[in-house]
């Protein structure tokens, strides 16, 4: 019988020795729903990208121009709200449930204030952003509309990400996965009607008229905004209605505490800075790619979507590692934290090695899902096969960073990611792009991911990431 995370935390607090078989089972129990969720999310993104890609090369290029900016803005917000879920995991590990519920309440106030501010900022700059990024004039209107609609939904996007992360911190990986899968399905349904115009389709041998808004790129953004809004409301509803360690119907204060703010500053600020560093580097990479032509822009954008099949499994395991290490650190069990960290990291390396092999084998077929443009397919398949070799070490960096974040060592993650992205990837891409085009950009990415993985494994082995200790 597999232990629940709550039972494991109780045994850790009592100083019991938990067998390796039990720790492996609970790691799998938390990882598998998250991995399946990420794979379904990626599959839905494939369908989403294919719906836009089959319109032509320009629509995915328009989305690709602003995609790095969506990563930047969303990444900063993710870094900040991840600090709340780390606090909750550590408080639950220490059996401080009232403190955990207090953090949840404060996170709701944070989400409301920062979410609305981020939405206003994104909508405000959307008109000018594509021009700043060097987009061709023919792409700017669609790119601007996409970013504005996406930004308007940020409060709900934040709510979904924040509250599902908190549910995972309690050991409930299934409910967040179900919410995410539903959101992806709704996204595809909304896109089906919003992207395409009214048309005739064949259904069981009969010609049927299907209504469509014909919005193309803005329709894709609107479908995403509507589906994430529903997801955010569902996640909030679970926390409001379910009786559990984070049930906010139980008595508690909504007062913002100095301890929560200190922990948010200590953990959240480096995480937000890390996301900003990674995403701003992506913005500069898009600036480099945007000068390589529409085919390269489309191949780059769709190639990133195709690669998601590999690394999303790593992020699923990362979700589990944050919860597991967070609770182990909260229970003051460094030995268990180390065990979970290495167990999850090895799982990430193994799964992403297998998916990397699949990426190399099926690269042309994957690109063919997204677009019918032969030039985009050929270039996209070429760069995906380069990237396939980096997947195992990418997995190491993803999961090891999650383990370190769960322990509160967000500063170490920030430094390693800053060096690898800005010192290695951007430098190599700048040097190789003029000579090799998009192939040079992706070769730089492959080299950098291998170096990043090695750096994270070295830090994991040294153990200094555990010196941060439990939160206040």
Q: What role is predicted for each listed range?
A:
Residues 46-50, 128, 162-166, 188-193, ...:
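Alpha-helical transmembrane segments of multipass membrane proteins
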Residues 18-50, 54-55, 68-87, 112-119, ...:
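N-terminal transmembrane alpha-helices
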Residues 28, 32, 44, 80, ...:
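Residue-level signal for transmembrane alpha-helical positions in Major Facilitator Superfamily
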Residues 180-187, 305-308, 418-427:
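Small-residue-enriched core segments of transmembrane alpha-helices in multipass membrane transport
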Residues 39-61, 130-137, 193-198, 207-215, ...:
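Helix-terminus/linker motif at the lipid-water interface of multi-pass membrane proteins
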């Amino acid at each position: 019988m597999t232990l629940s995370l709550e039972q494991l935390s109780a045994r850790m607090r009592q100083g019991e020795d938990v067998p390796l078989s039990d720790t492996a089972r609970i790691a799998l129990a938390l990882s598998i729903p998250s991995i399946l969720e990420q794979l379904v999310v990626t599959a839905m993104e494939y369908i989403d990208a294919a719906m836009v890609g089959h319109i032509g090369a320009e629509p995915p290029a328009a989305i690709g121009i602003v995609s790095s900016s969506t990563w930047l803005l969303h990444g900063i917000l993710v870094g900040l709200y991840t600090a709340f879920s780390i606090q909750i995991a550590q408080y639950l590990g220490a059996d401080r449930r009232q403190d955990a519920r207090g953090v949840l309440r404060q996170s709701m106030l944070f989400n409301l204030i920062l979410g609305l501010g981020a939405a206003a900022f994104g909508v405000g700059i959307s008109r000018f952003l594509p021009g700043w990024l060097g987009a061709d004039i023919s792409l700017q209107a669609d790119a601007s509309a996409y970013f504005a609609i996406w930004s308007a939904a940020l409060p709900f996007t934040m709510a979904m990400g924040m509250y599902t992360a908190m549910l995972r911190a309690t050991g409930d990986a299934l409910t967040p996965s179900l919410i995410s899968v539903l959101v992806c399905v709704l996204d595809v349904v909304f896109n089906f009607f919003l992207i395409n115009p009214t048309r005739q389709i064949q259904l069981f041998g009969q010609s049927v008229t299907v209504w469509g808004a014909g919005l193309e790129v803005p329709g894709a953004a609107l479908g995403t905004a509507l589906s994430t809004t529903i997801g955010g409301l569902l996640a909030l509803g679970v926390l409001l209605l379910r009786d559990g360690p984070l049930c906010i119907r139980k008595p508690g204060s909504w007062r913002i505490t100095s301890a929560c703010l200190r922990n948010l500053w200590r953990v959240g600020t480096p995480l937000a800075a890390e996301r900003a560093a990674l995403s701003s580097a992506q913005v500069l990479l898009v600036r480099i790619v945007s000068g390589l032509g529409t085919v390269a822009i489309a191949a780059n954008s769709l190639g990133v979507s195709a690669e998601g099949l590999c690394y999303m499994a790593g992020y699923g395991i990362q979700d589990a590692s944050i919860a597991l290490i967070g609770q182990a650190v909260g229970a003051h069990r460094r030995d268990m934290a180390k065990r979970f960290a290495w167990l999850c990291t090895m799982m990430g390396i193994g799964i992403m090695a297998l998916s990397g092999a699949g990426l190399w084998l099926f690269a042309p077929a994957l690109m063919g899902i997204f677009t019918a443009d032969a030039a985009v397919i050929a270039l996209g398949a070429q760069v995906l096969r380069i990237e396939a070799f980096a997947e195992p070490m990418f997995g190491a960096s993803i999961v090891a960073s999650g383990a370190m974040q769960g322990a509160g060592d967000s500063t170490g993650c920030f430094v390693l990611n800053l060096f690898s992205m800005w010192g290695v990837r951007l430098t190599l891409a700048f040097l190789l792009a003029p000579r090799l085009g998009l192939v040079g950009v992706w070769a730089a990415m492959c080299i950098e991911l291998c170096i990043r993985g090695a750096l994270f494994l070295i830090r994991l082995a040294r153990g200094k990431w555990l010196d941060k200790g439990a939160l206040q």
